[in-house]
Amino acid sequence: MSKESNKAQEPQIEETEAVAVETEVVEDAASLMDELTQANFRVEELEQALAAAEAKVEEQKDSVIRAAAEVENVRRRAAIDVEKAHKFALEKFANELLPVIDNMERALQGTSSEDEATKAIYEGVELTLKTFTSAVAKFGLTQVDPQGEAFNPDHHQAIGMQPSEEFPANTVMMVMQKGYMLNERLLRPAMVMVSQGGASVDTQA
């Protein structure tokens, strides 16, 4: 083959090689784009799965929080119910004790420590009453004995009013029956006689 013929074929060979290289590059690029597309799809799938998992975790966390709150509410309501039941039972029991205390106080009023015939009885009842009131005080039962105090309609029940030079107006001048508080709540008001103050002056005399 002549040199001229070889030279004529060289551009064709180079062009063919260039086309082959370009084709290979295009195919590689296409393959790479396909891999990138698949990778993007996979990333999206993983992101969706992660979002779903996070949502599930939040849902479960919220359920746990609600369950814990409900348990706490049930525990609180149970504690309140127990406290109410305890107070009601104690209040009922205390109301049953009040007549016993009243009777012992009347027994003391009907006897005298100065009278030898009743001195032993007086001292025995007095000691019993003192011990009894001290015992019930441990459970929150306290007396309302407002002798000489200002009349308080929240704790006292007036059974009458009388003029008095000794006591100012609206002052408890006599306690007919002591009242009682149970854990700072009124159990029974004190029955009292209230002073009207000094007798009015007759200006026409």
Swiss-Prot record:
This is Protein GrpE. SUPFAM superfamilies: Coiled-coil domain of nucleotide exchange factor GrpE, Head domain of nucleotide exchange factor GrpE. One of its GO terms (molecular function) is protein-folding chaperone binding. It comes from Shewanella loihica (strain ATCC BAA-1088 / PV-4). Belongs to the GrpE family. It is found in: Cytoplasm. Its main location: cytoplasm. Participates actively in the response to hyperosmotic and heat shock by preventing the aggregation of stress-denatured proteins, in association with DnaK and GrpE. It is the nucleotide exchange factor for DnaK and may function as a thermosensor. Unfolded proteins bind initially to DnaJ; upon interaction with the DnaJ-bound protein, DnaK hydrolyzes its bound ATP, resulting in the formation of a stable complex. GrpE releases ADP from DnaK; ATP binding to DnaK triggers the release of the substrate protein, thus completing the reaction cycle. Keywords: Chaperone, Cytoplasm, Stress response. Pfam families: GrpE. HAMAP family: GrpE. GO terms for biological process: protein folding. CDD domains: GrpE (cd00446). GO terms for cellular component: cytosol. Homodimer. The lineage of its organism: Bacteria, Pseudomonadati, Pseudomonadota, Gammaproteobacteria, Alteromonadales. PROSITE patterns: GRPE.
